[in-house]
């Protein structure tokens, strides 16, 4: 050390803090995107709700019993009706009104729902919960010729 000079400071000076400039936002990225990613990570971490066996099926049954919309899709049903009509009409192609197809679909779904209700009662009578083919056959047989369609 030289005479007359001041002793050097023992502390090191800190470099100045740098503030990062804000990221430019484009139309593709939103400023809330990191928050959404954090939420997704948090939702993955929590386990998914598990229902006991049969609970989901009962929820589905209640949902469909409350609803009034048609359960069979319209396009496959209309194709089936046209195909059956072609086989019984000796190859003639008939035009169908949309209201006629809807009325036929309503009637067929009502028939199927009633048939499944009766056949499930037959399975309960046999002290079973599972629906078998023999239950459907028995329900049709009990209904008779007019109600069971043959």
From Swiss-Prot:
A GO CC annotation given for this chain: nucleus
Biased amino acid composition, Basic residues: 41-53
Stretch list, region Disordered: 1-55
Record flagged with keyword Repeat: no
Top-level division of the source organism's lineage: Eukaryota
Keyword Transmembrane set for record: no
Protein name, per record: Histone H3-like centromeric protein A
Coiled coil spans: none
The protein's assembly and partners: Component of centromeric nucleosomes, where DNA is wrapped around a histone octamer core. The octamer contains two molecules each of H2A, H2B, CENPA and H4 assembled in one CENPA-H4 heterotetramer and two H2A-H2B heterodimers. CENPA modulates the DNA-binding characteristics of nucleosomes so that protruding DNA ends have higher flexibility than in nucleosomes containing conventional histone H3.
Family: Belongs to the histone H3 family.
Database matches in InterPro entries: Histone-fold, Histone_H2A/H2B/H3, Histone_H3/CENP-A
Molecular function via GO: DNA binding; protein heterodimerization activity; structural constituent of chromatin
Disulfide bond entries: none
Span list, region H3-like: 53-150
Protein localization: Nucleus; Chromosome, Centromere
Species the sequence originates in: Xenopus laevis
């Amino acid at each position: 050390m030289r005479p007359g000079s001041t002793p050097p400071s023992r502390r090191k000076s800190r470099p100045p803090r740098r503030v990062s400039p804000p990221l430019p936002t484009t139309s593709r990225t939103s400023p809330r995107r990191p928050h959404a990613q954090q939420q997704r990570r948090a939702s993955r971490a929590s386990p998914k709700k598990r229902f006991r066996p049969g609970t989901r099926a009962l929820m589905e049954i209640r949902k469909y019993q409350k609803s009034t919309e048609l359960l069979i899709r319209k396009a496959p049903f209309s194709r089936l009706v046209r195909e059956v009509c072609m086989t019984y009409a000796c190859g003639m192609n008939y035009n169908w009104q949309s209201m006629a197809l809807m009325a036929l679909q309503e009637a067929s779904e009502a028939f199927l729902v009633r048939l499944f209700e009766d056949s499930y009662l037959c399975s309960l009578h046999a002290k079973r919960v599972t629906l078998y083919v023999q239950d459907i056959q028995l329900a049709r047989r009990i209904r008779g010729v007019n109600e069971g369609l043959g």
